[in-house]
């Protein structure tokens, strides 16, 4: 199902609009989100692209993840440093700063899943 939008820039309010469906061949996706913004252009994820997400709360370092921060959703490359108790959500555009969470802030971060495919227009 197409659940709604996900920020590729400043996080946006997470809303479930799961009344549409999008088809993608040979993906292990559980749902799809529409990219909004340009923070992930270095990973070839552009504004308006359909991003297919495999639902999981475990994402490997360096994978692109859909993440909810309180009630706002964003798509970023995820890095976790357990010895420092630090999570970094890194954009793929130098115009944006990474989002860094430590200590108590980590309780406000929820991983929805990992990006497994992207579908968009030829550029």
Specify the residue positions occupied by each region the protein language model found.
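Short acidic low-complexity segments
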Residues: 53-60
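Well-ordered beta-strand positions in beta-sheet-rich domains
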Residues: 50, 75-77, 100
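Well-ordered beta-strand positions enriched in small/hydrophobic/aromatic, beta-favoring residues
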Residues: 33, 65-67, 89
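Hydrophobic beta-strand signal
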Residues: 52-53, 66
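Short solvent-exposed strand/turn elements
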Residues: 89-106
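Residue-level recognition of conserved beta-strand positions in structured domain cores
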Residues: 77-78, 91
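Short, positionally conserved secondary-structure boundary motifs
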Residues: 1-47, 61, 73, 80-86, ...
């Amino acid at each position: 199902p197409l659940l709604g939008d996900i920020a590729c820039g400043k996080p946006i309010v997470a809303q479930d609009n799961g009344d549409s469906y999008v088809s993608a061949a040979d993906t292990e996706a559980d749902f799809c989100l529409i990219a909004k913004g340009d923070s992930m252009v270095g990973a070839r994820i552009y504004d308006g692209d359909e991003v297919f997400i495999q639902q999981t709360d475990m994402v490997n370092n360096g994978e692109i993840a859909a993440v909810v921060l309180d009630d706002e959703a964003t798509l970023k490359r995820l890095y976790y440093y357990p010895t420092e108790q630090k999570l970094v959500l890194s954009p793929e555009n130098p115009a944006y700063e990474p989002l860094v969470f430590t200590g108590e802030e980590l309780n406000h971060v929820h991983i929805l899943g990992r990006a497994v495919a992207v579908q968009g227009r030829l550029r």
